[in-house]
UniProtKB/Swiss-Prot annotation:
It comes from Thermofilum pendens (strain DSM 2475 / Hrk 5). GO terms for cellular component: cytosolic large ribosomal subunit. One of its GO terms (biological process) is translation. Pfam families: Ribosomal_L5e (PF17144). This is one of the proteins that bind and probably mediate the attachment of the 5S RNA into the large ribosomal subunit, where it forms part of the central protuberance. The lineage of its organism: Archaea, Thermoproteota, Thermoprotei, Thermofilales, Thermofilaceae. Keywords: Ribonucleoprotein, Ribosomal protein, RNA-binding, rRNA-binding. GO terms for molecular function: 5S rRNA binding; structural constituent of ribosome. This is Large ribosomal subunit protein uL18. InterPro entries: Rbsml_uL18_euk. Signal peptide: none annotated. HAMAP family: Ribosomal_uL18_A. Belongs to the universal ribosomal protein uL18 family. Part of the 50S ribosomal subunit. Contacts the 5S and 23S rRNAs.
Length: 196
């Protein structure tokens, strides 16, 4: 494994594929709080964190399981859910006195209109100042889940068995996938009212 006397072993979190220290260093040098977006295998987390010499301090955080408190019945890792998480985390951060942040997407690839940037759009709409280009943010209809509702409508007409299989989570939670945009609007309104 070693390649000679001068071989330097990478840091542990870099070897494990968890941290890109070159990106992290540039983010920390800015001195601004970071909007940290992490989409995991079953959940998603959006945090506002500040780097200190002893480690990161989380100022505000929103976990996908928190959306249940506000009545969210949909999938907790899709574009509308990540938007709501970004919105929720930013509202909490604004209450703590944070007004601006920079985006930390970790090892996620920066794909235009992706779930990660849906969370950023949610934070922007909540009132947080984040330097980001408009070209990477998803459209409003996609954020509301209209693409999911249209797909559900098409699938319900063409293949009802597959519709029941694909949207079994929505149906068991008592949510018609075709009414996802209206459900999204009501949950966003509840978050806004709760964190005035």
């Amino acid at each position: 494994m070693a390649r000679g006397a001068r071989y330097r072993v990478p840091l542990k979190r870099r070897r494990e594929g968890k941290t890109n220290y070159y990106k992290r260093r540039k983010l920390i040098i800015s001195g601004k709080p970071r909007l940290v977006v992490r989409v995991l295998s079953r959940t998603a987390i959006v945090q506002i964190a500040k780097a200190t010499p002893k480690g990161d301090v989380v100022i505000a955080s929103a976990h996908s399981n928190e959306l249940k408190k506000y009545g969210w019945k949909g999938y907790r890792r899709n574009t509308p859910a990540l938007y709501l998480l970004g919105f929720l985390a930013a509202k909490k951060a604004l209450k703590q006195g944070v007004t601006e942040a920079i985006v930390d997407i970790g090892l996620h690839r920066p794909v235009k209109a992706s779930r990660v940037f849906a969370a950023v759009k949610g934070a922007l709409d909540a009132g947080l100042k984040i330097p980001v280009g408009d070209g990477v943010l998803p459209e409003d209809d996609r954020v509301r889940g209209e693409h999911i509702a249209n797909y559900a409508k098409m699938l319900k007409e063409s293949n009802p068995e597959l519709f029941k299989l694909r949207f079994s989570g929505y149906l068991s939670a008592g949510l018609d996938p075709e009414s996802l945009p209206e459900h999204f609007d009501s949950v966003k309104q509840k978050i806004e009212e709760a964190l005035q």
